[in-house]
Each structure stands twice: as C-alpha cells, then as structure tokens.
Amino acid sequence: MMTEVHDAGRPRVVIFNGSQLQREAIIPFASRSSCFHHQLCSRGHLLIIFLLLVSPFNDAAVDVDGDDNDNLIIDHVPDAKSSSEALLNFKSSLSTSSPRGHEVLGSWIPSNSPCSGNNGNWLGVLCYEGDVWGLQLENLDLSGVIDIDSLLPLHFLRTLSFMNNSFKGQCLIGISLEPSSHCTCPIIASPVRSRMMLPGYDLSQEALFGKQPIQRQHPHLPGYLLPQVFELSLENNRFTGSIPHFPPNVLKVLNLSNNQLEGPIPPALSLMDPTTFSGNKGLCGKPLESACNSPSQEANNPDSRNSSTISGQSSTDVIRKSPTRLSKVMLIVAVCLVVLCLLIVLILIIRRRSHSSSQNPQPVESNYSNNDRDQNAFTSSAPDDHVTLSGNSTYSNNQHSNSNKAEAPTAAVVGKLSFVRDDRPRFDLQDLLRASAEVLGSGNLGSSYKALLMDGQAVVVKRFKQMNHVAKEDFHEHMRRLGRLTHPNLLPLVAYYYRKEEKLLVYDYASNGSLASHLHGNQSRLDWSSRLKIVKGVAKALAYLHNELPSLALPHGHLKSSNVLLDKYLNPVLMDYTLVPLVNLAQVQHLLVAYKAPEYAQQGRITRKTDVWSLGILILETLTGKFPTNYLALSTGYGTELATWVDTIIRDNESAFDKEMNTTKDSQGQIRKLFDIGVACCQEDLDTRWDLKEVVQSIQSLNDKDHGHSNSDQMHDAGV
C-alpha cells in the first residue's frame, strides 16, 4: 500500500512496490503522520517543527553542496497540461485485462485535469496543491513496460505504487531513497535525472543486484544509497550475482533467502541469522555452515570489487568537500544541538506536569478520547500514554485504572505471528510494526492499540506483560483453543505473538467503541432498546463460553463494560475472555474483576457462578448508567465500596434508572424485570444466586415493551 513521509507539507519518499518478481515483493513504507492531514498534534508539533527547521533535506533548505540549485523549490504553479501529457504517455505503455484496470485507466482522459487542489480527478492519481505527487496503481493486473521516462515532467512526483500487478523482470526505482526508506527490489540503472530527485541526491545510475557489476557512470554522484537502506527483503526471487559489501551496523533487517546468489557472504553480515541466506546454493561463509573453498572465490567476485570501489569513491567525495560546505554543515549541527537541548527540557517539563496531574485522576475517564491522536510510529515509545496512531476514535479500558501507562511494542520484537483463523488475510509482525497505530487504552492486564495495516485492514492489538510464567506450549495450546471459538458476540482472536517477556493478541476491530464509553464517556447515549439488545448479546456470549469450556471455573473471568465492544449496529462483542489460565497466579487476583466477587473475598473460592456475579454488575451498570465504585482498583476482595454501591442501587430501586434511556410507560415493566435479574445475579450467597442458564432464559424472554412481542423479536430470540 501507499505510505508517505512528509516534510514542510509536501510528501517526500519516492518509492514503488515491486509487482511480480517471481513473487510479489512489497516495499515497506514509513508510518504516516496525521499532522499532514490535520492540525499539528498537541505534543508532537514541536518535534515536527524542529525537524522542518534543521533537516538538510527540506525542500526549502539551503543547498549544502552549493552546486545543485535545480533542486531548490522556490515557487511553483502547477502545470495541468504537462501533467496530463506525461500521464497519458505513461498510460500508453500499459495494458490490462481486468475490469478494474480498464475502469482506472479509462478515467485518464485529456479533457479532465488530473488534479484539483488536493483531490485527484483521475483514479489512482494522488495530488497535493494541484501537483501530481503519487501514482497508486495496485491490484489492476497491469502489464507492459514501466516507462519512467514519460514521468519526467512530473517534477513533484514522490510516490509510486504498482503492487500486485503482472509486471515481470526487474523493478525500477529511478528516484533516490530517504534515510528512513525501505527497499524490497533491486535498484538498477534508470535515465531519470535530477528533476525527479530529492534535493542533493541522484542515484539514477546505481545498481544493487543483477549480473552486471555496479558501475559509476557518473563519478561525481555520491554513493549514498547503501548506507541509507536499513531493511532489505528480497526473498523468494531470482536474483543472481554476489552480495555487495554493506557498511557495518547499517542493515537492521535483511532477508535474501531463496534466490540464486553466490560467492562469500560479506564479513559485515556474518552475524546475521543463517536463515537470512538460506536457499542460495552458491553462497558460502559465516553464518552458513558451508565454508568457502579458497580466498580466490572472493577475488573472483567482480561485484564485491566494484562495491568496494564505490565505497572508496564515496569516501573520497566526502573528503573533497569544500570548506564552505563544511562550515554550513557545522552550523546546521550546532543549531540542531541547541534546538534538541531545548526540546529535551520542554519534554521533561511536560512529563512532570503530566505526572503531577496523574496523581489526581478524574472520577471517570472517557472511553473515547481525542488526546490519543498523536502520530508516531507504532514501534516507538511516546511520552505518557500517547502512542501513535491514525483514525478518528479511540476506546479505552482506562476507567479508574492505576495500572502503568500505555507502552507501544518496540521494534526489538522479533519473530512471527501465529494465526488461529484461516479466513483472515495474512500479515506478519513487521506489518504490525510499520502500521499506523492508535492507542485505545491501558487497563489492568495491558495496553490496547488499533493498527491500520497497509492493505486497509484494521485490527486490535492487545499487549500483555502479566503472562510471563505460562509455558510456551501451554500458551500455544490455549491460543488454538481460543481460535476455535466462534460466536457473533465474541470478538474473534485472529493471531498472536509469543515472547517470554510479553505476549501480543490480535483481534478483529469493533468500530463503535465500548459499552463503558457510551455509558460514562462522551459517546452518544443508548436508549432502552439498545441496552436490552446489548445485555442479551452479552448473556448469549457468556452462555456460549460456559458451554464450550466446561473444564474452566471462569470461562470469561474479566467481564466488565469496557470489555464489551460495539460494532456499527450496536451489536455487542466480548473481548479479554478466557484469560485466567494465562495470567500469573501472583497477579490474577489483583487484575481480573471476577476476583472482586464476594465468594473470593469471604471464602477464597471461585465458581462458575462468579461470571454470573460479573454479569449482574454489568446489568445494573447498564440500567443505571452509574460506574461501579472501586470496581477497577488494583486491590483484592469484594470491598465495602462495591458492596455499598450494589446496596445503594437496590435501595434506590427505579429512581436509580438512567434518565438517558428515554423510557416509556410501555417499557417500565420490562426494565424492572431486567433490574430484578441483575439483583439476583449479585446475591452474595452462592445458593441463592441464579445460575447462568436461568439468567439467560430470563433475559431472552424480555421485550422492549410490556405488551406485545414483535415477530422480528421472536425470530431474533429463537436464534439464541
């Protein structure tokens, strides 16, 4: 998919994804910044301004070389005619056999300008301020020759994505890469010149892989490419030749497996995992077990010699820089250091204020907050509970929680995701780490994030740290068990990631937030019919868990309003279910709400009726709109506050009902019946507390009105 990196309001990265190199090769992109599309983020804007001021690659920055003035952007008026002609020439080199491809290319007509401001009039054309800055031609079954020459008039072209088409052969990238760019296909010679270059870069004549050795056809061009590429994923292609010499400690992720490479592995890569080079019969040397036969193998390797030559020439270029450039660089570095020091001081002040305010939390935090929209990478940490993400809404498990602030998974996480469902699109851990992420909340068990993958799929990622005592095989088996659970009112587990220190669970995404956010936050209030519908769905899901998991004393164990999510039709789905066997025994009584039940506080026991008690609390909370006192505090036992809360609800009777339900006289009797069911579920005596089967049957018999029962309701209840 397409991703942009912005500076000074204009997209910068110029890449396209490989189409079909014996296998689809997808170029990973940097995470997106909401500050480009929205107003500057509340805490991130200072850093953005800092980067714009000091970045030597800024479009309006001073030309450090002093001899490449063509790359400076001073003023510009979009040339619609030139853009149209360039795109039509490019279109003429393409062909497609798919209806969608004909639809997209058919919208490219001379009578209509490609861009109107920031809107693209031609399908697949991305625009900014009237300029064509990107082409997104994906999944169109395109074939033919990628005619880069025809795109030369597009002076502000920054992004090309030709993913999932039928192009064959080598993948052209005629535009240089930023230091944060990724590359997943070979960079070969291209006639594109400085008109499509980012300032200070021209790598159009460089080559990375292929039978021809790397050649310097323009000796004055700096060899900046290899030191900037920190991730290469070239597996499952047919690349030939040898591996060039990379500077040490530059490549963070490398995968060259299943190609036709040969020769010795460069020493700088000798500490990589052997699987990085597997499937290349001609490779030898560490970390592979096959040793090179003789030193002559390396001497006979023309690619190695040429890559070394390029490295040497690059060093010579740097040494020959003029004193004028050196002084400019030193000035920029000095400014960077000063601004960085000021930024650090400002961050410390903000963190101290945040820490002070956290000592006096508000009575109830909204489950939907606009404070969590700071943009950053899903892989980076952020101050306080601000973790990157894009999107328009968030939900949280953070009511009255004294747990640690949300922390984003870091890029140090390595390994593969394990999928438990066959009907979901596949993605890997690196896709999650690159995804736009949005913090959803931080609860007792861990942190939640919404991740928007490059293909547009949205998932919820739950990060747990209180599960590091469970054995690996036991964890895998429990995940497989959860993957087999299928119910319309359960949030499906899609995949998981295991590491001893922490675990990641990946779920489907529910778009309408949590029940708690509608009851206590700034979401729209729920009427009586919606609340009854939600309680019915929760009861069905709880009954399903009890039927499918008869060996567990607590099939759910963590039922609360913030763990009841709602889809766009207000259908409820439960999350954080069946986690009791995974949580460390030392923390389970502090973390899970089921251990607030009276039988655990009084007798130290947990039964299958404990989930019924949690359901009763949920019913009373739903009818009254009142948050259970001390319900989420990290303490053991039932607690006098929660006992008093239940007694107060019972004593207030009908006067405690939430006025936001907009009830009528016709529904008063049904509301009273549901209230009585909730009270029966909250009985402290286990013998008098209803069992789940009786509770579910009573709830499903309710209607939104006292008299009459619609056919649709009868059919709906019959499917219980």
Swiss-Prot record:
PROSITE patterns: PROTEIN_KINASE_DOM. It catalyses: L-seryl-[protein] + ATP = O-phospho-L-seryl-[protein] + ADP + H(+); L-threonyl-[protein] + ATP = O-phospho-L-threonyl-[protein] + ADP + H(+); L-tyrosyl-[protein] + ATP = O-phospho-L-tyrosyl-[protein] + ADP + H(+). InterPro entries: Kinase-like_dom_sf, Leu-rich_rpt, LRR_dom_sf, LRR_N_plant-typ, PRK1-6/SRF4-like, Prot_kinase_dom, Ser-Thr/Tyr_kinase_cat_dom. Residues 291-317, 356-382, 389-405 have a biased composition (Polar residues). It is a single-pass membrane protein. The chain crosses the membrane at residues 330-350. Belongs to the protein kinase superfamily. Interacts with KIP1. Dual-specificity kinase with both serine/threonine and tyrosine kinase activities. Required for postmeiotic development of microspores. Involved in embryo sac development at the late stages of megagametogenesis. Involved in the phosphorylation of KIP1. This is Pollen receptor-like kinase 1. The gene is PRK1.
